Amino acid sequence: MAKKYTKDYRVTDTLNEQGRRERRVDYIGKTYVWHEGDAARKALRFANGICAVGWAAWLLPLLPRSEATQTWYVLPFFLFIALPLGLVSGTLLWLRRSGEVLTHREADQASNRIPGCGLFMTLLPMLSLGGETILYIQQRKLPGRADVLFALGALLLLVCGLLLRRMAPHFRTEIRE
């Protein structure tokens, strides 16, 4: 747990019937709710769909062998898209299980991590597409089918990142009264 959230918890030690020490952790911090309520829940479901499409758009272009997957200034940017995509996917699944009332940590992750990862999911495909464009300008030939699939996957990931950035206002939280 991050040091930032340690004041939100209270640890109590008690003895059980067998004489063993049991440690209990209770959340005592502020609780948060979604600013937009049902609209935020719909946005979470839509964002989960975006992540599913993003994973397909990331994995499918890597399967066939192409010029882009063999070029050092194209492939690393495309591979690193998995980091923000994985962070967003994990955060969304975690938030989906959390219920209506959020802890301080969950509220921070919803408000900060999703838009930040959306930014990187926008920038990294741009860099990958830029590298692929340079590759084909240098080679002076048309790309093959696998390279077109790679470019379409990067474009789809770019759209996924833009959609996540656009949905950022839906993930605002407020302190529960």
Which residue ranges define each predicted feature?
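Cytosolic juxtamembrane helix at the C-terminal end of the final transmembrane segment
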Residues: G161-E177
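N-terminal, intrinsically disordered, low-complexity segments
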Residues: M1-A40
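Helix-coil boundary and interhelical linker segments in multi-pass alpha-helical membrane proteins
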Residues: L63-Y73, I137-R145
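Alpha-helical transmembrane segments
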Residues: T69-G86, L149-L156
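Alpha-helical transmembrane segments and their membrane-interface junctions
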Residues: L123-L152
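Short membrane-interface loop/juxtamembrane segments of multi-pass integral membrane proteins
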Residues: V101-G118
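Membrane-water interface of transmembrane alpha-helices
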Residues: A82-L102, L164-P169
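Canonical alpha-helical transmembrane segments of integral membrane proteins
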Residues: R45-R65, I81-L85, F120-T133, L156
